[in-house]
Amino acid sequence: MIKVYRYEIVKPLDLDWKEFGTILRQLQQETRFALNKATQLAWEWMGFSSDYKDNHGEYPKSKDILGYTNVHGYAYHTIKTKAYRLNSGNLSQTIKRATDRFKAYQKEILRGDMSIPSYKRDIPLDLIKENISVNRMNHGDYIASLSLLSNPAKQEMNVKRKISVIIIVRGAGKTIMDRILSGEYQVSASQIIHDDRKNKWYLNISYDFEPQTRVLDLNKIMGIDLGVAVAVYMAFQHTPARYKLEGGEIENFRRQVESRRISMLRQGKYAGGARGGHGRDKRIKPIEQLRDKIANFRDTTNHRYSRYIVDMAIKEGCGTIQMEDLTNIRDIGSRFLQNWTYYDLQQKIIYKAEEAGIKVIKIDPQYTSQRCSECGNIDSGNRIGQAIFKCRACGYEANADYNAARNIAIPNIDKIIAESIK
């Protein structure tokens, strides 16, 4: 199991902040170039492969065409001379990040459901695990030694060794760091990030450890239904217990922020024409800060929701969580579900569930809101409005979200539904 903890960089040891900041900014520029170029090459290879398949009846072998077994190798060969300041291992990790992301979303890109990934200015710097080490000094400071530069860049910048930095370690971060130093946790690929709003640099240390094992029953399943009025509804088949997370705070926050954003845009639109240049930048900055506020609220809320969900699954002894596959979320017809990042919430649930030893299964949600969780009858008329479910066949009546969550908690429910509607 891999987790991440963020440590603030206090200062570099062998450089002043101006020198260190210059190095990090230059590496950010090269990282951005590498990510975008690798994505471009992956896109071009996908297009070439598709045309080749149409003309020859089979996909090309990258070794024959590119001279490398995969796009990652070809991209590294193409990019390394232009992103020459980056440590070779870190550059390889950066290119892998771009090609892996492109591959993960290739189908969505082809369908037109999402645009080709692009990377902006303040992006993380990658560090492979071999290029980061941490130690505690006799006076108590924690030092992280980082291999950031290639040999030519070291000569160019007059840096003779690894760059060492003092990091702030306290609270839960101290426990994690002490376990890393004791060998209980292992450092894995990490990142350096910049918080533009605070103008601070952080070291995101990833660490690997064996998750605690709990006695959980795989046959006990929690079903999760995602909605609007109730953001998350949790139900089970082995117990009448139910839990829910109201969606009101999310919707209220979204409306407030959207209203504020529109107001800011109008103010910028009608501002005097003479207020150009830096004046425009000043007007845009609050809008950018609003975006940060939205992102922070989303991240915090989804962390809180996912923790509660997994905790309730453990409480009920569930070894399995089943939830909706939201790949085609737009087909659901809810604009709210599109606005709120349910994908991010699901990723956090999966992450925390796996950490607890819980299996996560995604199911096709079609008809789960129309099916009676008591008798299995499927009828669009069973759903009376947004909140009430009443079965036309057996008369079972319940909260509509609870009924859907109970259906989702049934093993192989999507297959059962597919058979029943044939």
Curated annotation (Swiss-Prot):
Subunit record text: An asymmetric homodimer. Guide RNA is probably required for dimerization.
* Cofactor: binding comment: Mg(2+) is required for dsDNA cleavage.
- The name this protein carries in UniProt is CRISPR-associated endodeoxyribonuclease Cas12f1
Name any cofactors this protein relies on: Mg(2+); Zn(2+)
Region annotated Wedge domain (WED), chain positions: 127-211
Name the EC number(s).
3.1.-.-
Q: What does this protein do?
A: CRISPR (clustered regularly interspaced short palindromic repeat), is an adaptive immune system that provides protection against mobile genetic elements (viruses, transposable elements and conjugative plasmids). CRISPR clusters contain sequences complementary to antecedent mobile elements and target invading nucleic acids. CRISPR clusters are transcribed and processed into CRISPR RNA (crRNA), which requires a trans-encoded small RNA (tracrRNA), but not this protein.
Q: Please list the disulfide bridges.
A: none
Q: Where are the residues of the annotated region Linker?
A: 212-220
Q: What residue range is the signal peptide?
A: none
InterPro entries assigned = Cas12f1-like_TNB, RNA-guided_DNA_endo/Transpos
Misc remark:
Belongs to a group of putative class 2 CRISPR-Cas systems, type V-U3, which lack the proteins involved in adaptation.
Q: Which family does it belong to?
A: Belongs to the CRISPR-associated endonuclease Cas12f family.
